[in-house]
Each structure stands twice: as structure tokens, then as C-alpha cells.
Amino acid sequence: MTQINAQLAHEPRHDWTLPQVEALFDLPFMELMFQAATVHRAWFDPSELQLSQLLSVKTGGCAENCGYCSQSAHFKTGLKAEKLMDAEVVIAKAREARDGGAQRFCMGAAWRELKDRDLPKLAAMIGGVKALGLETCATLGMLTAEQAKQLKDAGLDYYNHNLDTGPEYYGDVVSTRTYQERLDTLAYVRDAGMSTCCGGIVGMGETRRDRASLLHQLATLPSHPDSLPVNALVPVAGTPLGDKVKREGEIDGLEFVRTVAVARIVCPKSMVRLSAGRDDMSRELQALCFMAGANSIFVGGKLLTTPLPNMDDDSKLFLDLNMRPMGSAKIVAPESVAAE
């Protein structure tokens, strides 16, 4: 418990070694859960969840070859490429999200990097969403330092740019963008004064050491991610990694919980978010993730191109777990529950 006591007594560490992170993964499951829950309670109210909603504002046709992604132009997944949405449409979707209880609205575009020509339309989206009282987040691929400053000036609060996996396995995931380019974009975001949203995907065929390496990278950044999404791969037919996982099997649920728990311990102040793959998780598995330190989720029925649980199911789960959203939003029982 020495490392955990240090986490409770001081600001988060940035000097984790990879062997130390691996040792956390190797703890007996119940001990790991206890340590993660202890850290979580030191920094957060364990009964609160942050609710975010993500909208794909530009879908498909991406030039990247990320082996998990349905939106890559390199693979035949049946997804039709679409143009960048108009700001008015995005703002209307954000209003619906706010009225549904979301506190943060994220906008995602399927392209390799942000083009300067799209900045005015994106700035209008950001300003309109912010005017609704929502936190704003965007995931728009690689940025230059100047673009990061312009997004900050437009009012963007958070920028998402995932590392996806550890550097050792990264070459098996994507070859059109280097690991260093991802780190550079995160540096531009930090330097511009925006908060970072950065995590990865598990269940892509990587080893436990690769998962530890990803979390080691995140825990040794100059500042820990403000939001740390943990995605479970949703296998998409026609993508290399999706087809591989369908052949070889998906990640074990308890191993996923271990990943969430270690993320909580090494990045104690981050909002650890259950992201893609939650629709395939049982209520019990989600509850274990919350106990392990996850305190943020995506809602809204869809995450870019993959499904999420519907709000009625989420509301019932939150009620049964005695959990509530952060802020002023309230979860109300769906009609089917209220009638029981």
C-alpha cells in the first residue's frame, strides 16, 4: 500500500516506471480493486458520474489506416463518407444532449488533421455549443500549434487525441501517423491552455504489458489527461483488428476492469471514462468499472459510429447503483421503472 498512501498524501506522480505499472496489473484482483477504490474516493465522490455526449460532425472517408476504425477509407466497412455538418445542425444536437442530461458535448471529425479552411465553421459550432452552457470538446486529428491556439480562442475547453495503445504495439494498429505526432499534438493542446482528453483502446490483440505501457505513457506526461477514456474495441467487420479479434476472441471482462483500476491509480485526478464498447458490457461489469474508478461515461445511444446503451437502460442502472450525474442534471426513472 506504500504507493497508494503516497497517492493519497500528495499530488499525482509523474515518475511511474513501467515495471511499477505492470506490478499494479499483477496484483490480486480484490486488492487492486480496493486500492483503486481508495484512490478514487480520495479525489472524487464515488456516487457521481460525468455524462458526455459525442457527435460525429464529419463521418467517414478518413485517410488514416487505424486498424480498428470503421471510418478509414482504407477498409471496406460499408460506411458512407459525409461532409462536415453545418453549425446550426450541430448546435441543435447539442441542445438535445443538454436537455437529456449531458454536461459535456464532444464533436468528432474523421480526418487525419484539421484544415485551416474548416476552422471558421468549427469555431461557430464551438461558440454555439458553449452558449448552451455545455463544456465543449473536439477530436479533429492532428493540430498545429497555431490551430490549437485558434480553437482555444474559439472557446474550446477540451481536445481529445488518444494514444490508442503503448508505443510497442502501435505499429500493429496504424502506420499513417507516428506516436510522436500524437504526443506533439497533445503538447500543442497543453501549450494553448486547453484541457486534454487522452486515453486508448484495449482488446485489439495487445498484451497486458502493452496495456501497462499505454498507461505508463499517460501517467508520465507533463500533466495527466484531464479526461482519460478507456475504450473496449468494438470489432467492425472489414477492419484488420476487428477481423482479428473476431477470430481470436475479445478481451476478458475482468482484464478490462483491471485496466480501469490501474488507470485510476496512476492518474488519480483524471476523469476516467467508459467509452466505446459499453453497449456490450453487462450491468454487473459496468458496476465493477465504476467501483474501480470510472466516473465518466458517454450517453446518447451512439458513439461516432458504434452503439451505446439507450438512456432508459442507463437511468435504470444509475438508480439501481444509487449513482447520480455530476452537476445539476438529475436522472429520472424511465416510465417502465416508475410503473413498477
Swiss-Prot record:
Listed cofactors: [4Fe-4S] cluster; [2Fe-2S] cluster
InterPro entries: Aldolase_TIM, BATS_dom, Biotin_synth/BioAB, Biotin_synthase, Elp3/MiaA/NifB-like_rSAM, rSAM
Pfam family, any one: BATS
Matching CDD domains: Radical_SAM
Listed GO biological process terms: biotin biosynthetic process
Cofactor note as given: Binds 1 [4Fe-4S] cluster. The cluster is coordinated with 3 cysteines and an exchangeable S-adenosyl-L-methionine.
Positions in coiled-coil regions: none
Binding site residues for [2Fe-2S] cluster: C106, C137, C197, R273
The protein's Enzyme Commission number: 2.8.1.6
Lineage top rank: taxon: Bacteria
Protein name per Swiss-Prot or TrEMBL: Biotin synthase
Protein source organism: Caulobacter sp. (strain K31)
Lineage per the UniProt record: Bacteria, Pseudomonadati, Pseudomonadota, Alphaproteobacteria, Caulobacterales
Gene label: bioB
